[in-house]
């Protein structure tokens, strides 16, 4: 979340940034934050003054008694009692103001960087780069859900029977392809210096608040009400929360972690042709990169992550493009985000397969993730993460873009992992 110092020192810039994200009532909300913070500070000032007076009077009472000034001592005792009673009310008032302030800050998104373009939604995102070769498919090319049925790779109906829509069952070479991609992505991450983590896929509320999924995405997360736990929408949540309430040594940075997990998203309100097959699922596999770094290095770290994801798509021989997201299309927590999309020749549309984001200090402030400098100062870290990669749409694109009259060709980079060159 934003720090009070950010808001008080750069009030106008913060409001402009929130308006770029199309955050409703930005000015009014920030004014409410400042008012609540002033109330908390003013109450604290009065409380501190009262506590100082109580300490002073308490010390004087003993001296007055020794000097035989019983009336003055009694007056001092009565004043101490009055102040203590008043301080109880002041403490409650200050605690309430602090709670109100914290709850307000939780509802405010991160401020986008100046390099983030203006815009309302996906149509305003800026194409930064395009790569890969366009695929020439047979005239009777099929979308992946029909290919999955033809080659008995994925059973969507069986998933509906077992669980419901959005929970496919992978079979045979479909399951092998899924596992091959996971291992390929993890191996590539390790080659790039990432440490593999195997985290829980269920987290508590504090973890959800730490990375910003709560309260913003509460309705999109599966909630186990009996135990008050949440199924993770991304490995970002448990992996980043490893460093909640941690002060790192400067020499430990950067931290580079990767994790493969199942991810769970309710995707409430998603209907229509864009959700067919693997395009939008409630449960899916994903490999995530998480980095923690010093502020002065996070721009370089972000670029390294972008290069890593681009390298994966190149090795998979997929046509792709990189988008710089506009303010209105960015996530609640991101300060800067790039999306990677692969082109589906069979569906004639672009499919998002990765988002790579820099969160500046926004998550770190929530998490209290800090580092100690050589000068013994404690500073907030920068956190970054990105999908490398999300599997469903990658599988969809691989099936569709590599279909031939003989079957589905496997990219060379994956053959050592699949053990086969063709699905037929």
Model regions: which residues?
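N-terminal alpha-helical targeting/anchoring segments
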Residues: 1-135, 153, 157
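TRNA-recognition modules of translation machinery and tRNA-sensing kinases, especially anticodon-binding
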Residues: 27, 129-424
């Amino acid at each position: 979340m934003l720090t009070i110092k950010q808001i008080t020192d750069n009030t106008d810039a913060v409001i402009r940034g929130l308006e770029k994200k199309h955050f409703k009532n930005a000015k009014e909300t920030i004014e409410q934050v400042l008012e609540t913070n002033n109330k908390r500070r003013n109450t604290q000032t009065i409380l501190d003054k009262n506590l100082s007076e109580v300490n002073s009077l308490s010390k004087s009472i003993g001296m007055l008694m020794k000097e035989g000034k019983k009336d003055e001592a009694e007056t001092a005792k009565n004043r101490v009692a009055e102040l203590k009673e008043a301080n109880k009310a002041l403490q409650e008032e200050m605690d309430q103001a602090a709670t109100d302030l914290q709850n307000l800050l939780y509802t405010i998104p991160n401020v986008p960087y100046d390099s983030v373009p203006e815009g309302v939604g996906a149509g305003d995102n800026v194409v930064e780069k395009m790569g890969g070769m366009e695929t020439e498919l047979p005239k009777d090319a099929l979308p992946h859900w029909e290919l999955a049925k033809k080659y008995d790779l994925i059973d969507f109906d069986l998933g509906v029977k077992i669980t419901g829509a959005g929970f496919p069952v992978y079979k045979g070479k479909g399951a092998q392809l899924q596992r091959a991609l996971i291992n390929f992505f993890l191996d590539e991450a390790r080659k790039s210096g990432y440490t593999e983590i195997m985290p829980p896929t269920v987290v508590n509320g504090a973890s959800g608040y730490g990375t910003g999924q709560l309260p913003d995405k509460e309705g999109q997360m599966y909630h186990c009400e009996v135990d008050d736990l949440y199924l993770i929408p991304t490995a970002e949540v448990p992996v980043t929360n490893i460093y909640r309430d941690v002060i790192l040594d400067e020499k430990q940075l950067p931290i580079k972690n990767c994790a493969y997990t199942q991810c769970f998203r309710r995707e409430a309100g998603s209907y229509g042709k864009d959700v067919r097959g693997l395009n939008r699922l409630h449960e899916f596999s994903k490999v995530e990169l998480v980095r923690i770094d010093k502020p002065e290095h996070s721009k370089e770290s972000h670029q390294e992550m972008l290069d890593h994801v681009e390298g994966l798509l190149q090795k998979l021989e997929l046509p792709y493009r990189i988008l710089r997201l506009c303010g209105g299309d960015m996530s609640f927590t991101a300060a800067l985000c790039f999306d990677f999309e692969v082109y589906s020749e069979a569906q004639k549309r672009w499919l998002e397969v990765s988002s790579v984001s820099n969160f500046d200090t926004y998550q770190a402030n929530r998490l209290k993730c800090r580092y100690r400098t050589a000068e013994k100062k404690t500073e907030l870290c920068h956190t970054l993460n990105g999908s490398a990669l999300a599997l469903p749409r990658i599988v969809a694109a691989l099936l569709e873009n590599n279909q031939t009259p003989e079957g589905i060709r496997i990219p060379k980079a994956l053959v050592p992992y699949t053990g086969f060159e063709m699905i037929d």
